[in-house]
From Swiss-Prot:
Keywords: Ribonucleoprotein, Ribosomal protein, RNA-binding, rRNA-binding, tRNA-binding. One of its GO terms (cellular component) is cytosolic large ribosomal subunit. One of its GO terms (biological process) is translation. It comes from Actinobacillus succinogenes (strain ATCC 55618 / DSM 22257 / CCUG 43843 / 130Z). Part of the 50S ribosomal subunit. It comes from the Bacteria. SUPFAM superfamilies: Ribosomal protein L16p/L10e. GO terms for molecular function: rRNA binding; structural constituent of ribosome; tRNA binding. HAMAP family: Ribosomal_uL16 (MF_01342). This is Large ribosomal subunit protein uL16. The lineage of its organism: Bacteria, Pseudomonadati, Pseudomonadota, Gammaproteobacteria, Pasteurellales. Disulfide bonds: none annotated. It holds the Pfam family Ribosomal_L16. PROSITE patterns: RIBOSOMAL_L16_1, RIBOSOMAL_L16_2.
Length: 136
């Protein structure tokens, strides 16, 4: 699973997920999976989508993951009263804004890429769309 090796602080405020995304262009591969909605992806969801894509392309081509879960999410244990401090870090998430390219792929045909991204999109909690690299 993806998570930072070390961080400046163990726990962070909840914060808000507003604004527009950076990394909106397909820059490494030829095809991409772009977020249409806003939300957050857990490290498990990112990995599940990656596995689905890798199996769909039968390990051909190359896949780039353009998101990284760098925000810790804390949870209190079951049946624990409120108060007594913030809970323990349970998992890591990446905050996603509309327009962010999540995955990229190269070395496969468009049909295979579309199929692989469709399988990956089924594993993700946000709406996505298929994009291709624009050459200028």
């Amino acid at each position: 699973m993806l998570q930072p090796k070390r961080t400046k602080f163990r726990k962070v405020h909840k914060g808000r997920n507003r604004g527009l995304a950076a990394g909106t262009e397909v820059s490494f591969g030829t095809f991409g999976l772009k977020a249409v909605g806003r939300g957050r992806l857990t490290a498990r969801q990112i990995e599940a989508a990656r596995r689905a894509m890798t199996r769909a392309v039968k390990r051909q081509g190359k896949i780039w993951i353009r998101v990284f879960p760098d925000k810790p999410i804390t949870e209190k244990p079951l049946e624990v009263r409120m108060g007594k401090g913030k809970g323990n870090v349970e998992y890591w998430v990446a905050l996603i804004q509309p327009g962010k390219v999540l995955y990229e792929m190269d070395g496969v045909s468009e049909e295979i890429a579309r199929n692989a991204f469709a399988l990956a999109a089924a594993k993700l909690p946000i709406k996505t769309t298929f994009v291709t690299k624009t050459v200028m």
